[in-house]
């Protein structure tokens, strides 16, 4: 059962707990000027045998019992150490966890060889470890990294990572242009004018012995006819040459390789080219006429002239 003491008894008890008057330092103390009644269990009162007076010996005994009840039971140290007589490893989990593949990708490294498991001693030399390569550091041997040193030949399975190389971008080489095997390649960044002269070569679709592309000045002005054998202006810049090349590549299919005339469509260029070759594939279908033309429209016009003559003769008769 629980019983409560009055305010006077609690204040009286506080006189016994004053450290300056009582030699017992470890006894329970009660606050001075306490308005709350002091709650004391009957079991503690019977165990002390002295009413409401608690001395330091009993309180120390209670604290020791509480400590013993809450003490954590740890395994013996001998189970954690290896047994050198039987040469057995300690009873611990020897699995080693390494970062996942995402960590290797964030480190900007790529593995070369698969990882292997090999038992090594704790006092191994630096020759048994590979060299690590990182993107921002120089090659660092494993011996410079902090590691444990032990004189005992402790053998444990340890994963030895393999060599990694950094992912560096490809080196950009200067752009070079070569026209023919007899000429040497010239860097366009250092000699833009010389590169223009080499690039201005006869196109493959043009038969040999004919003219070349029109000049850049004429192409920019939009002229439909240029002089044969024209050469690009040496003082032109690379941007102008690049723009003119883009324009000329579209007009190359419509340009006559003989006179340099630019036609409106490829079919017109084919008809125009027959003038230079002298071919007349379109022959007159009128009976007794041996004329032929290089353009079909001219042949049809000539055929209508035969029909008009015939109609005129029929009308007169």
UniProtKB/Swiss-Prot annotation:
<dbReference type="Pfam" id="PF00096">
    <property type="entry name" value="zf-C2H2"/>
</dbReference>
<dbReference type="InterPro" id="IPR013087">
    <property type="entry name" value="Znf_C2H2_type"/>
</dbReference>
<keyword id="KW-0677">Repeat</keyword>
<feature type="zinc finger region" description="C2H2-type 1">
    <location>
        <begin position="254"/>
        <end position="276"/>
    </location>
</feature>
<dbReference type="GO" id="GO:0008270">
    <property type="term" value="F:zinc ion binding"/>
</dbReference>
<dbReference type="GO" id="GO:0005634">
    <property type="term" value="C:nucleus"/>
</dbReference>
<comment type="function">
    <text>Probable transcription factor involved in the regulation of the transcription of genes involved in cell rescue and defense, as well as cell cycle and DNA processing.</text>
</comment>
<protein>
    <recommendedName>
        <fullName>Zinc finger protein CRM3</fullName>
    </recommendedName>
</protein>
<keyword id="KW-0539">Nucleus</keyword>
<keyword id="KW-0479">Metal-binding</keyword>
<feature type="compositionally biased region" description="Low complexity">
    <location>
        <begin position="1"/>
        <end position="15"/>
    </location>
</feature>
<keyword id="KW-0862">Zinc</keyword>
<dbReference type="InterPro" id="IPR036236">
    <property type="entry name" value="Znf_C2H2_sf"/>
</dbReference>
<feature type="region of interest" description="Disordered">
    <location>
        <begin position="1"/>
        <end position="22"/>
    </location>
</feature>
<keyword id="KW-0805">Transcription regulation</keyword>
<feature type="zinc finger region" description="C2H2-type 2">
    <location>
        <begin position="282"/>
        <end position="306"/>
    </location>
</feature>
<dbReference type="GO" id="GO:0003677">
    <property type="term" value="F:DNA binding"/>
</dbReference>
<dbReference type="GO" id="GO:0043565">
    <property type="term" value="F:sequence-specific DNA binding"/>
</dbReference>
<keyword id="KW-0804">Transcription</keyword>
<keyword id="KW-0863">Zinc-finger</keyword>
